[in-house]
């Protein structure tokens, strides 16, 4: 079927095809091995007792391997490396495998986290002792300097281990690149001092301050902080155009402020506190941002009103309009978008967690089903053992009964010989008594035969109770399925002909009308009408399908997956065609 559909490959269709092959053993038929059908399962091979028995008795038989899909979690780089042929066939494990093992160990991770906290504490103490001239504190400063170098070297060793584990994956990970940049920025001032740059240089002081950025290495260590940062980045991405619009309004109001407050900025009146706020474009942008935060807006407005040349109306309109647009409207929009984005992220995480919970419950349910099957198989094995014991007991009982019957027959033959040797007179006199005794013996023999037959029937019923129970269960299931089908047909008949009695003379006509009704009935209505009855049925009942029907069912189900995929693509093509048509 997959070759008929071309290069299109669907996981569902492949799963259905594998199920079909597993059910009907098509691999053996295609390879000409239909006569060699596997008789044993993998469970029997794994069982030591069964394996020993099979190896002693039947070594050349095939084994059916039941391959099931297994959900794998996060596959680490070390696991990928272990599955490579070069590593598996090599004599010694590579250094990259050892480096990955060290990086993944909890001891090393906790050691790096403790160094990050220690680095924060050391920087805090160094800042406090920076301007101190007390000579008694020099050993403490030396210890802090040594600790700082030890922390820096530990971070460099960590980066080297990451490179040794996988150099290309290191540069593909954004958190690893961030870690590398922070470490190199803290290492750069030491090299600059070795080159000969003065320690009092401003750039060198800035580079030394960059050592504080080592505390940001915690972001890459805790997944919770990563989630918060990713949520912030995602929220800012969704607000890109809103921020662009806000920046445009910032620029417009900054330029307008330079023109509106020109007299105020050039005024010679003394005691003006904010006359430099609108002197040029940069100061005007800073002032607009201050007004955006609702800070000093009334003080600035009162200071502007001190200048008679500045219009009170235009200055008031400028400030109030910017407060309405920027501080009230834009700020609330930003807050609302941030809240909605965080809510969407939370809903997505909640859906993912519920999906994982449902998947976990489904796995537990599957395990219970497997345990139930194993228990049923063990019960069948015990019942078969009991049946074999009953068979041996009945065979021994029948042998004993046969020996007793032979002994009784020999005694009767001896008695008859002694009776023949008697005289004729005694025979004539005792004919009547003999006849009566013979009648009594016949009745006793018949009774004993009947009792033997009853006992044999009881034994046979005990012997074959297990087998007949299994056969009855299968027959009862098929009969129950037929009864359910007849019940559904009766309900459909009653819906189609509500006034007709069930036992009418025109049974054939009603049955023909029922067939026509089922043919004309829509599939969805048929399913909806029969769905309550199907839900009320016992879920343990199984319907046995014929082999050809089951094979056809799998084929149709596989073709349905391809048809659904083709329908989806046709819908996409139709949408694309309509969009192109509207563009033209």
Swiss-Prot record:
Family: Belongs to the cation channel sperm-associated (TC 1.A.1.19) family.
Feature: compositional bias, Polar residues: 376-386
This protein's name: Cation channel sperm-associated protein 2
Activity control mechanisms: Activated by intracellular alkalinization.
Organism annotation: Rattus norvegicus
TM segment ranges: 107-129, 139-164, 174-198, 202-220, 238-260, 313-339
InterPro entries listed in its UniProt record: CatSper2 (IPR028747), Ion_trans_dom (IPR005821), Volt_channel_dom_sf (IPR027359)
Alphabetical GO biological process terms: calcium ion transport; fertilization; flagellated sperm motility; sperm capacitation
Catalytic activity: Ca(2+)(in) = Ca(2+)(out)
Gene: Catsper2
């Amino acid at each position: 079927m997959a070759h008929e559909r071309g290069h299109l490959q669907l996981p569902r269709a492949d799963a259905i095809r594998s199920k079909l092959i597993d059910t009907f053993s098509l691999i053996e038929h295609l390879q000409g091995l239909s006569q060699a059908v596997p008789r044993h399962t993998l469970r029997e091979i794994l069982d030591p007792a069964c394996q020993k028995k099979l190896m002693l008795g039947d070594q050349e038989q095939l084994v059916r391997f039941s391959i099931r899909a297994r959900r794998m979690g996060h596959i680490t780089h070390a696991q990928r490396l272990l599955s490579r042929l070069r590593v598996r066939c090599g004599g010694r494990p590579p250094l990259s495998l050892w480096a990955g093992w060290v990086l993944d160990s909890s001891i090393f991770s906790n050691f790096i986290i403790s160094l990050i906290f220690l680095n924060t504490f050391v920087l805090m103490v160094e800042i406090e002792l920076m301007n101190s001239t007390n000579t008694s504190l020099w050993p403490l400063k030396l210890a802090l300097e040594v600790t700082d170098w030890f922390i820096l070297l530990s971070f460099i060793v960590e980066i080297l281990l990451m490179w040794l584990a996988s150099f290309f994956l290191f540069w593909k990970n954004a958190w690893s690149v961030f870690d590398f940049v922070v470490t190199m920025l803290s290492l750069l001032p030491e090299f600059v001092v070795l080159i000969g740059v003065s320690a009092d240089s401003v750039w060198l002081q800035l580079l030394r301050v960059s050592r504080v950025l080592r505390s940001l290495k915690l972001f890459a260590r805790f997944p919770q902080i990563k989630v918060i940062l990713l949520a912030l980045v995602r929220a800012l991405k969704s607000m890109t155009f809103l921020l662009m619009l806000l920046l445009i309004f910032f620029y417009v109001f900054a330029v307008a402020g330079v023109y509106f407050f020109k007299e105020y900025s050039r005024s010679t009146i003394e005691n003006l506190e904010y006359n430099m706020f609108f002197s040029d474009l940069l100061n005007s942008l800073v002032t607009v941002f201050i007004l955006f935060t609702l800070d000093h807006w009334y003080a600035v407005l009162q200071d502007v009103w001190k200048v008679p040349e500045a219009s009170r109306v235009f200055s008031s309109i400028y400030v109030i309009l910017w407060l309405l647009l920027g501080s009230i409207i834009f700020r609330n929009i930003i807050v609302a978008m941030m809240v909605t984005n965080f809510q969407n992220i939370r809903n997505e995480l909640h859906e993912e967690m519920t999906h994982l919970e449902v998947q976990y419950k489904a796995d537990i349910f599957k395990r219970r089903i497997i345990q139930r099957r194993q228990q049923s198989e063990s019960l069948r094995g015990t019942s078969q053992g009991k049946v074999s014991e009953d068979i041996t007991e009945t065979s021994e009982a029948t042998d004993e009964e046969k020996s007793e019957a032979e002994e009784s027959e020999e005694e009767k033959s001896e008695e008859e010989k002694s009776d023949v040797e008697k005289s004729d007179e005694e025979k004539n006199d005792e004919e009547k008594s003999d006849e009566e005794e013979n009648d009594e013996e016949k009745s006793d023999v018949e009774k004993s035969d009947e009792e033997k037959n009853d006992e044999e029937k009881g034994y046979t019923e005990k012997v074959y109770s297990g087998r007949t129970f299994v056969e009855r269960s299968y027959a009862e299931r098929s009969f129950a399925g037929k009864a359910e089908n007849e019940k559904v047909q009766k309900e459909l008949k009653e819906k189609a002909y509500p006034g007709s009695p069930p036992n009418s003379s025109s049974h054939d006509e009603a049955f023909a009308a029922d067939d026509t009704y089922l043919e004309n009935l829509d599939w969805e209505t048929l399913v909806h009408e029969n769905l309550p009855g199907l839900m009320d049925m016992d879920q343990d009942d199984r319907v046995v399908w014929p082999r050809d029907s089951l094979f056809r069912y799998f084929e149709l189900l596989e073709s349905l997956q391809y048809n659904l995929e083709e329908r989806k693509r046709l819908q996409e093509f139709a949408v694309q065609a309509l969009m192109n048509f509207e563009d033209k």
